[in-house]
Amino acid sequence: MKTVLSTIWAKAGGKYALIVIGAWLLVSALSLVWTPYSLLDTNGFNAWASPSAAHPLGTDGTGADVLSWLMAGSRTNLMIAVLTVIVAAVIGLLLVAAMVSRSGALASTSVVVVDALISIPTVLIALILSVPFGASAAVVIAACGCAYGLNLARILRPSALLAARSAYVESALWSGASSVRVFFTHIVPNTLPVLCVQLSMSAGTSLLAEAGLTYLGVGVGAGVPSWGHSLSTSVKFISVYPMAVLWPGLVVTMVVVALNLFGDALRDAIDPLTNPALREAA
């Protein structure tokens, strides 16, 4: 683990990613116990105030402190990103296991199902889920997790199929190892470089999706702090006070870029093809 982190830190993009992601985690933890102002602390007479010592990032249309809402929103967005990655990984790996199954019927059926479902937009999935469940973070997580899981399965299939047909997998199966054990000990490790990149991209894309879905009214619920909520409530007043849109937009952009760079750096750190130290160790 220490070697992986040092390899990531050695890259310029990796430094940026670790610093930004580390700051995100710290702010999320800090917001559990402290924010400059209560989220319910509003003052209509102080709406759209410019940045000042009292309000470093200014206030929004209700007079609420923008920094406090962004700090509290970081916690919501962290939850969405982490849970989306978990859901996408579970769905993606289950589908990959079916797609490389030694049962030809199961494998071919899984490929057809993935190809058919992957064409459904994330927004449509969210709209369908919002009908019975309403707008919530759970809808964002479920919609993004399903959509990204399907995409993950299709991307991982070639490398997983190559590993499944290798001699060492055949030997493991002939020696009596179960298909589940072979999948997780021999096939999944061969997909790790691609898996890491795709999951980090899924985390970043989920933040963009949350902002878009919240703007459409099917994202996080009203009154729930999130970066998408801060954007959606202030974008209509961009001509009045552009700074209210600038801050959440800047935060989302910085974190999404950091997650993508982290995925690239992590792939380079754990892939023997790009890390000479791993080739020498092998």
Residue ranges and their predicted role:
Residues 261-282:
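Short cytosolic juxtamembrane segments of multi-pass membrane proteins
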Residues 1-37, 113, 191:
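N-terminal signal-anchor/first transmembrane alpha helix
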Residues 56, 60, 101-162:
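Generic hydrophobic transmembrane alpha-helix motif, especially the helices
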Residues 31-34, 80-115, 127:
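Transmembrane-helix boundary motif in ABC transporter permease subunits
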Residues 85, 93, 97, 134-185, ...:
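Membrane-cytosol interface at the C-terminal ends of specific transmembrane alpha-helices
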Residues 126-127, 131, 200, 215, ...:
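Hydrophobic alpha-helical transmembrane segments of polytopic membrane proteins
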Residues 127, 132, 136, 140-141, ...:
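Non-cytoplasmic
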